[in-house]
Amino acid sequence: MRFTTIFWISLTVLATVRAEDGSHAQNEVQAGDGSHVQNEVQVGSEPQTQDSIETPKPTIKYIDFGDLTLSPSASSPAKRNVTLPPDTTMRPDPRQTEPPTEAPTPASTPAPTPDPGPWVDKWIGHDQVKPFPQPEPVTISEKAGVKFKPQIQIRTGCEPYPAVNEYGETGGGLKTTGKSRGNCGGSGYGSQVYGRSTWIRGVWAIMYSWYFPKDSPSPKMGHRHDWEHAIVFIDNPEVSEPKILACSVSSHDGYKKYNPCPSWVIDGTSLKVRYKHAWPLNHDLDATGDGGKFQDSIMWNQLTEDARRALNSVSFGKANTPFNDGKFMPKIENAWPF
C-alpha cells in the first residue's frame, strides 16, 4: 500500500471520529424510582441544575503513523548498500575548499656576465691560424655578403692569410727580410676574407678585408702585417636583384673610388681587385679586369666573441684592422664615392 493511500484513509477516519464526538450524546439518568430515563445532552450546553451529571470524556481515537512502514516502489526505490573499491578516497562532507594552487617559483635572475677585463694578446705563427669555414648565410646581410664577395688577384707579395682563429689567437706576421713573397705563398689551412656591412645615406655598403703577414715590396722595405680592403655600394640588399652602384678600393692612406664601377671590373656580382705595388711604394689594391681567387668569407657578426675582441684590441703595427668597431664607420665615410 502506498503512503498516500494510508494518509487519505487516516484523514477520513479522523474526520469521522470528530463528527461522532460533535453529535448529541445520549446519557442515561437513573430516576428516584429506579427506572432509567434517557436524556439527550448536547455537548457544550448548559449543565443541568437539578442534578450534576458528569459528561464522559470522548474517547480519543488516532492512528500512530510512527508504526507505519513504507513499501518500496518504482518512484522511491529502496536504499541499497554500495560497496566502493578499497582504494576509493571519500571527500569530507561538507566538502572542504581545495587549497589554492601554489604560484610557480620564479626563475632566478641570471647573474650579470662578469667583465672579462682587458684583452690579452695571443700571438701564434702566421701559418698556424685556422680560418673560419664559410657559414651558411641566414640573414639578408649575410646573403648579400656572399652574393657580392669579390675576387682578388695577387701580382706581387704575399697571399692573403687568416688573421684570427675562433679562440682569438692572431697571426704574428713576418719580418720584411727576404723576398717579397718569402714564407707567405699561402696558408696550408686556407685563406679568409672578412666582411662587414651597414646602411649609409640610403645605400648599403659592404666592406671586404684581407690580411697579409707582411708588406714588403723589396727586402728590408715595408713593414710587418698588412690589411687591405674593398667596399661595394649596392642599392638595397632586400630586393630580389640588388645592383652595384659604386665601389672603392684601399690605396695607401686613401681610396680609389669608382662611381659607377666600370663594367669590366665586375664579374656577375663580384668585384675584381688586384693586390700590387709600384716600387718603392708599399702594396695596395686597385680594380682590375683580370679574374682572381675567392676565399671563405666570414661576416663580423659570425665571428666568435673572442675573435671580435682580438680584432678590436690587437695592434698590427702600421697596419690597422679596417672593419673593427673603431675603424669601420670612419673608413666607410672616407670611401664614400657619391
Curated annotation (Swiss-Prot):
UniProt KW Hydrolase keyword: no
Q: Cite the InterPro entries for this sequence.
A: NPP1
Region labeled Disordered — which residues? 68-119
The subcellular localization recorded is:
Secreted
Membrane-crossing ranges are none
Give the main localization category. Answer: secreted
- Free-text note on domains in this protein's UniProt record: Key residues/motif important for the effector activities are degenerated in most NLPs, including the nlp24 peptide consisting of the conserved region I (11-aa immunogenic part) and conserved region II (the heptapeptide GHRHDWE motif) that is important for phytotoxic activity.
Residue ranges under compositional bias (Pro residues)?
Answer: 101-117
Q: Which UniProt keywords apply?
A: Glycoprotein, Secreted, Signal, Virulence
Name of the protein this chain belongs to: NLP effector protein 6
What is the residue range of the motif Conserved undecapeptide motif I? 205-215
